[in-house]
């Protein structure tokens, strides 16, 4: 049995070799010759999985080590009798921590406290719900918009998108990409919505590029109307709008979810799904795969204020490290994908052990996802 895996899926060879012969291939594009004798295909979001890719092949299972599935034609896979699995929630923590890194940088630069701002979260799934929990742990007011969940009667105080635009100082998008239907998200942030954003608002998109109309966003920025923008995803990719990149506050190469933990979760989730598909279910303990963190222990004295939190967050991950490289290579063919392929290892907050002499600080850091303990420092 031959299993094709994206060459940028960490631990893929190590895990899938338990099930068969493994061949690592580029994700964009998948070499057609490699598909000829393959039984299974494991991809990331850069690979379009559809009839054009798989017609006439013997692929019986496709796994995507991503939470999103808009790059996969699931209808075709069902029609062709091909098994399928995604990795929902695998990188949710990573995306939340990306958003925090960006917000804390902007807060320091512009001199505001997060607790003085209202954050509107559009899409309250794996990412949005975790972002809400961490923001509220800090005492930040959040407003939630998720029409599918609201229509299902899920618990939660869901608002309309118009309400969020009116009330929120920060608007952050965490939806799937639906190009049509009752919950269409293509250009959810369209020209009209972008025009209504508060002067000085912050707009964040770390889900899918076309959720925000990039042309309309550029037009507002070119008009000189005050707006801070954080974009990790673009319309289109990989050939992003260079003029838009020049005007946003933070621009990165679709790497918000790229922690080592997030990538490893994606790989292990599709590995476990494929082993189940084969009738030989196996489970993997994530901790057995991950290397030791860069920092052993940090000692924190006193209460946790915003500047201290910013230092801890940026010790693990400072979003500016990914902004500068994209600006250097913007517009150069192939460089967007190279940034993603050669991405520097990044860890999650849980990899940082913080020893606190303040009990409340330890409790708050634990709620935020740090590996924190209370231990009076003598």
Curated annotation (Swiss-Prot):
Substrate binds at residues 45, 66, 258. It catalyses: 4-phospho-D-erythronate + NAD(+) = (R)-3-hydroxy-2-oxo-4-phosphooxybutanoate + NADH + H(+). Its EC number is 1.1.1.290. GO terms for cellular component: cytosol. GO terms for molecular function: 4-phosphoerythronate dehydrogenase activity; NAD binding; protein dimerization activity. It comes from the Bacteria. Keywords: Cytoplasm, NAD, Oxidoreductase, Pyridoxine biosynthesis. The active site is at residues 208, 237, 254. NAD(+) binds at residues 146, 175, 232, 257. PROSITE patterns: D_2_HYDROXYACID_DH_1, D_2_HYDROXYACID_DH_3. Pathway: Cofactor biosynthesis; pyridoxine 5'-phosphate biosynthesis; pyridoxine 5'-phosphate from D-erythrose 4-phosphate: step 2/5. It is found in: Cytoplasm. GO terms for biological process: 'de novo' pyridoxal 5'-phosphate biosynthetic process; pyridoxine biosynthetic process. Its main location: cytoplasm. Homodimer. Belongs to the D-isomer specific 2-hydroxyacid dehydrogenase family. PdxB subfamily. NCBIfam families: PRK00257.1, PRK15438.1. Catalyzes the oxidation of erythronate-4-phosphate to 3-hydroxy-2-oxo-4-phosphonooxybutanoate. This is Erythronate-4-phosphate dehydrogenase. It comes from Cronobacter sakazakii (strain ATCC BAA-894) (Enterobacter sakazakii). The gene is pdxB.
């Amino acid at each position: 049995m031959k299993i094709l895996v994206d060459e940028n899926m960490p631990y893929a060879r190590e895990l899938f070799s338990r099930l068969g012969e493994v061949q690592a291939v580029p994700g964009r594009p998948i070499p057609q010759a490699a598909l000829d004798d393959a039984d299974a295909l494991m991809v990331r979001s850069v690979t379009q999985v559809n009839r054009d890719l798989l017609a006439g092949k013997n692929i019986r299972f496709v796994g995507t080590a991503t939470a999103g599935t808009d790059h996969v034609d699931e209808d075709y896979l069902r029609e062709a009798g091909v098994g399928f699995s995604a990795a929902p929630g695998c990188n949710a923590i990573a995306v939340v921590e990306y958003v925090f890194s960006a917000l804390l940088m902007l807060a320091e630069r512009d001199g505001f406290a997060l607790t003085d701002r209202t954050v509107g979260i559009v899409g309250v799934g794996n990412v949005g719900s975790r972002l809400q929990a961490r923001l509220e742990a800090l005492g930040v007011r959040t407003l939630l918009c998720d029409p599918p969940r609201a229509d299902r009667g899920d618990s939660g105080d869901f608002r309309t998108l118009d309400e969020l635009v009116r009330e929120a100082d920060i608007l952050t998008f965490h939806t799937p990409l639906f190009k049509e239907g009752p919950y269409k998200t293509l250009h959810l942030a369209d020209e009209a919505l972008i025009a209504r954003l508060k002067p000085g608002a912050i707009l964040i998109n770390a889900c899918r590029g076309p959720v925000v109309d990039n042309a309309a966003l550029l037009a507002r920025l070119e008009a000189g109307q005050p707006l801070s923008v954080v974009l990790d995803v673009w319309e289109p990719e990989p050939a992003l709008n260079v003029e838009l990149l020049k005007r946003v506050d933070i621009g990165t190469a679709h790497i918000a979810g790229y922690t080592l933990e997030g990538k490893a979760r994606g790989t292990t989730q599709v590995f476990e799904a494929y082993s189940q598909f084969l009738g030989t279910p196996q489970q993997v303990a994530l901790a057995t795969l991950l290397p030791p963190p860069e920092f052993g222990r940090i000692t924190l004295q006193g209460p946790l204020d915003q500047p201290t939190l910013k230092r801890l967050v940026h010790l693990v991950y400072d979003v500016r490290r990914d902004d500068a490289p994209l600006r250097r290579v913007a517009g150069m063919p192939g460089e967007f994908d190279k940034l993603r392929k050669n991405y520097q290892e990044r860890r999650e907050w849980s990899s940082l052990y913080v020893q606190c002499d303040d009990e409340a600080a330890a409790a708050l850091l634990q709620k935020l996802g740090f590996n924190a303990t209370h231990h009076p420092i003598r």
